[in-house]
């Protein structure tokens, strides 16, 4: 669209979000997005206030952004959640972009101006890890990059027959076929489970419940091998509490995996619902213990009734995932990033960054 054909967009402006914008932002979101985990306007407004105004990393220099149209009305929004990470053992500022939305009347330059304002902020690293194809194109056109490795999704079938049936088309025909196939599905999964090495059950070690303080201490040890890694700095209790409110994929479960000698091997956080796919929020382990940690994750999901486990790829885990027969796909969502510091961008490019779903926007539950 040429500038001549979009005079209204030319006179709009991007400004910092204020708490008194909440009603307008909630109204805009309810107009544009069909899915929400918070159906009432009051509940959604309260959640937006908590995330954008009262998170533990609030930074006046990293506000969420509003696009005002030529009439001074809220016509666009880009949420910003400041986070902290360390790069080569020194603190850096990170900004997570989320909930980009623009009213139909202002589409075109408005979204571009919001993303440009976000990427040119004072943060060392900008991240958005739920990008669709349109967002990816916009992001890259403004100088941002996509982490292809971190955008890969892996999946391990635990009950392969039930998983296949769950992906039949909807409607009466699909439901009827699924119902008729139940006896064969149960038999097929029983035979698959009996096959030697079918689930790769862990040999040794044990899993205990994962508390925020335990995770924080383990992260200090286990993540040291990454040049770029999260700095939770006392905020894990808040972060995990918010993540637990995400109910789309079931209950959030965490497990600390210990080696046979009691030493910490790693941990996992995943959402589990019986009969569904367990979605991994975070998976971490010492290089020598990754196979053990992955085995305990898969066993925990199987024991809780999941039919599959899926997560976002950490490149260093490829050998262990391959050994478990995990499938890979790269059809999005895209993990997008931008940094004005070449050395930080290089760490992302070469996979020397620990960036789990807990460290972006994926855990949010709007």
Regions found by a protein language model. Give the residues of each.
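Extreme N-terminal starter segment of soluble prokaryotic enzymes
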Residues: 12-13
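Amphipathic alpha-helical segments in well-structured domains
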Residues: 94, 111-115, 132, 136
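Active-site/acyl-donor-binding loops of N-acyltransferases
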Residues: 2-9, 63, 125-193, 243-245, ...
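Conserved acetyl-CoA binding element of GNAT-fold acetyltransferases
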Residues: 91-104, 276-286
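Conserved acetyl-CoA-binding loop-helix of GNAT-fold acetyltransferases
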Residues: 99-121, 128, 288-300
């Amino acid at each position: 669209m040429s500038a001549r054909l979009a005079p209204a967009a030319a006179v709009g402006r991007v400004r910092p979000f204020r708490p008194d914008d909440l009603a307008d932002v909630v109204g805009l979101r309810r107009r544009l997005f069909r899915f929400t985990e918070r159906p009432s306007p009051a509940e959604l407004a309260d959640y937006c206030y908590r995330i954008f105004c009262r998170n533990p990393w609030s930074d006046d220099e990293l506000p969420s952004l509003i696009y005002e149209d030529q009439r001074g009305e809220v016509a666009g929004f880009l949420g910003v959640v400041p986070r902290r990470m360390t790069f080569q053992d020194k603190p850096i500022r990170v900004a997570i972009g989320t909930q980009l939305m623009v009213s139909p009347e202002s589409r075109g330059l408005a979204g571009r101006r919001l993303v440009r304002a976000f990427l040119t902020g004072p943060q060392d690293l900008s991240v958005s890890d739920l990008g669709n194809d349109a967002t990816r194109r916009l992001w890259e056109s403004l100088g941002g990059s996509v982490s292809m490795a971190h955008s890969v999704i892996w999946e391990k079938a635990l009950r392969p027959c039930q998983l296949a049936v769950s992906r039949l088309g909807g409607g009466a025909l699909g439901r009827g076929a699924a119902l008729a196939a139940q006896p064969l599905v149960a038999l097929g999964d029983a035979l698959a489970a009996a096959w030697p090495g079918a689930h790769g059950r862990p040999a040794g070690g044990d899993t205990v419940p994962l508390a925020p303080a335990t995770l924080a201490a383990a992260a200090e040890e286990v993540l040291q091998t990454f040049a770029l890694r999260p700095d939770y700095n006392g905020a894990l209790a808040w972060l995990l509490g918010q993540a637990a409110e995400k109910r789309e994929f079931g209950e959030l479960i965490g497990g600390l995996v210990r080696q046979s000698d009691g030493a910490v091997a790693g941990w996992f956080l995943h959402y589990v619902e019986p009969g569904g796919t367990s979605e991994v929020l975070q998976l971490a382990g010492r290089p020598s213990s990754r196979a053990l940690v992955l085995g305990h994750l898969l066993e925990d999901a199987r024991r809780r009734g999941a039919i599959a486990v899926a997560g976002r790829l950490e490149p260093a885990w490829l050998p262990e995932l391959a050994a478990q027969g995990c499938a890979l796909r790269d059809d999005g969502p895209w993990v997008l990033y931008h940094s004005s510091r070449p050395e930080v961008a290089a760490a992302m490019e070469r996979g020397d960054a620990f960036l789990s779903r807990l460290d972006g926007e994926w855990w949010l539950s709007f």
